[in-house]
Every structure is written in C-alpha cells, then in structure tokens.
Regions:
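Alpha-helix termination/capping residues and helix-transition junctions
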Residues: 13, 68-69, 99
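Local sequence-structure signature of Cys/Sec-based thiol-disulfide redox active-site neighborhoods
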Residues: 30-73
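Mature extracytoplasmic/luminal segments of secretory-pathway proteins
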Residues: 16, 28, 49-52, 154, ...
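Sec-dependent signal peptide hydrophobic core
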Residues: 5-11
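Short, conserved sequence motifs used for protein processing/export or organelle targeting and
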Residues: 73-281
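Bacterial Sec-dependent N-terminal signal peptides
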Residues: 2-3, 14-43, 280
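Secreted/luminal cysteine- and crosslink-motif detector
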Residues: 20, 32, 53-56, 152, ...
Length: 281
C-alpha cells in the first residue's frame, strides 16, 4: 500500500513538473502570459554607409520620423567599405535590399502618412521577452493574429502573358526576423562630419536572414492564433557588437509573398515589430 501511494505521489510530481515545463519556454518567459500590443508599429529599414556623401541628410530625415512618433522603429544596415558592415549585414542587403543606390529607406518617413498607418489596427503584432544568463541571451518572440488576415488573393502577382493579365494567386507566409542592433557608434559621416550612429544592425539570430517561416505559403490563420519562437544567442561566440550595454534585440514580422507560378519569394513586406533593450538586463 505504501509503495502504491509513493508511486502515485511520484507520478503526480512528474505530471506537475512536465506541465510547468510546457508552460515555460527556454528563456524563462511564459509565452501564454506575454501580452502582445494591439497598436501598429512602423518599420524603417535604412541602407546606408559612413562613406555615402548623401546619407547624412537621410539620417536627419529618419531621426525626425523617429522623434515624430514613438512607435516608429528603425534599423540601419551598413554596407560597402564601412566599419559597421560585416558578412551578416551583407547577407541582409543581398536578400532584402536589392537597390544598388544610396541612400535607400524602406518605409515612409512622411509624418502624415505615418500617422495614417499608425492609426490603423494591425493584422498581427509581435512581442519580445529577453533574459540573460551570463553571455547567453534567451529570447522569446510571440506573434499574435489580431485581425482578419488573408493568406491568398487573386491577381496579386500581376503576371502578364501576351499583354493580358493572368488570374493567378499571390500566396503569403508569415516570417519572423530577429536582429541584434547597437546604438552609440561614433564615426564620421562623409560630407556631414562627426556622427553617432544608432540602430545599427550587427547580426541576425534566425536561421534565414529574411526571417524564419512561421506559416506555410497560403496557410490560413484565424483571429487569436499565436505563434512562439525561442532563440539563444551567445554574445561571446558572436562578437559583432562593441558594447553590449548599447545593444538591443529587434523582432520584425516579415510577410513573404509567392506567385502560384513560381516557387520563389518575390516580395517581402515588413509588418509589426518590437524592440527589447539588452542593456536593461
């Protein structure tokens, strides 16, 4: 009888422990308890270089946009002969920013248009939680569907054959990009002078630079659906940054599009985003 009771007690403890483990992701954050904002964010992706003679003025315009609204978020991707460029930023530029011209900003900096976008309720949004264990960052990202999201639409690809538009479907997927950014990087800007560079992309944490795929192309999602992804990042092994106190993690929902006539992504659209200051840990 005693052995039976002991077995029952051990079984209860094991079941209780497994339940707690399921509720807690590796970062120590309870994904179910993470509250995703129902407000839109506006993402500005800047292609830039310290050597670029016209990029200083573009940075002023971007800073005005950031100052205009607290929900404008920015990532600067440096390229060329630049102290803040590396193989990881080149991956990003090659995959996402196809224009060879400088400066290039993906996303509007017009105040009135930003106000219009930010007043709209988002179809989805992402929330970050970051813990630090020594040199390891443990990151939880939660995406929640907040509105009616269409995974396919007719005529979205705009394919023409013999001058006539073909009725094809544009299938969408939801991707999640996680990036390491750094503030407070001092370096002169060409034709501008001394400048402190902020929101500088240093590395990406996902397997794919354009973001890990959360849903398949055309996979239907419903209001209230949530998706959680977990990442670990070793600050010692990945020493792209200069000062971890000035670093932050940025999560971006990247919408991928694909025509039914091709197997490759042909368009990427930046949706919701969230930023977590690593220096606060």
């Amino acid at each position: 009888m005693k052995s039976t009771n002991l077995f029952t007690l051990l079984l209860f403890v094991l079941v209780l422990s497994s339940c707690k483990k399921d509720q807690l992701d590796p970062s120590g954050a309870n994904c179910d308890a993470m509250e995703v904002s129902n407000q839109s964010t506006h993402v500005l992706i800047e292609q830039t270089g310290t050597w670029c003679p016209t990029c200083g003025g573009e940075k002023d315009e971007i800073q005005e946009a950031i100052d205009h609204h607290e929900r404008v978020q920015h990532m600067a991707v440096h390229g060329g002969d630049d102290p803040f460029a590396n193989d990881r930023t080149q991956d990003f530029r090659s995959a996402i920013i196809r224009s060879p011209y400088f400066p290039t900003v993906m996303g509007s900096t017009d105040p009135s248009f930003m106000d219009f976008l930010l007043a709209e309720a988002p179809d989805m949004q992402v929330k970050l939680d970051v813990k630090r264990d020594g040199s390891i960052l443990k990151i939880t990202a939660k995406i929640e569907i907040l509105g009616e999201y269409e995974c396919a639409r007719e005529n979205g690809c705009g394919v023409f054959i013999d001058g006539q538009q073909v009725n094809v479907f544009d299938f969408k997927s939801i991707n999640l990009g996680i990036y390491l950014l750094e503030d407070g990087l001092d370096y002169p800007q060409a034709n501008y002078g001394p400048l402190t560079h902020n929101d500088v992309m240093r590395d990406y944490l996902t397997e794919v630079v354009t973001g890990d795929q959360i849903t398949d192309f055309g996979e239907e999602v419903s209001l209230g659906d949530t998706f959680c992804k977990y990442y670990e990042y070793d600050l010692t092994a990945n020493n792209y940054h200069e000062n971890i106190a000035n670093c932050k993690i940025m999560a971006i929902i990247v919408e991928g599009n694909k025509c039914e006539t091709t197997d490759t992504e042909w368009y990427l659209h930046f949706l919701g985003s969230d930023v977590f200051e690593v220096g606060n840990l």
